[in-house]
Amino acid sequence: MKDKIPVIGTGTLTDESVLPSMGDEALGVISPLHYSAALDNPQNKEFVKKYRAKYGKIPSYYSETCYTAMRLVHQAVTSLKGDVSKADRILSALQSVTLKETPRGPIKFDSYGNPIQNIYIRKVERVGGELQNTVIYTFPEVSQFWKYKPEEYLKRPLYTRG
């Protein structure tokens, strides 16, 4: 059936942690996410190389997310010279962090505390004998509001099923 209708799913559907067990059934599946172990940037190549050397497998979305989150925390704490005694200062420091070079690409935060980062459209392919999420399109610097102005978006009614 997937040769007639493309299979599209959430980013974690084909996460690198499950791809090996999915086999060829995963080929061609399309998914969006802010990370792929196949991203072609120097930071990701180094991250994948070191991760594979240490753990014997490629990193997943979960691994990269934890790694990048700790880099964000480290930069925020460093900017506070280690003084983490006041929650409001920690939050402010975190919201002001910008990382231009991470395995996933650049990341920063909007004034609401949500990330602004690239979203990658990925397609599962077999490359070098392994399944991977090949990036086929990049939406740069996506915020929670997509391409809408936050002020206008927030005026809209909340979604309900009723």
What are these regions (language model features)?
Residues 1-162:
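Extracytosolic ligand-binding ectodomains
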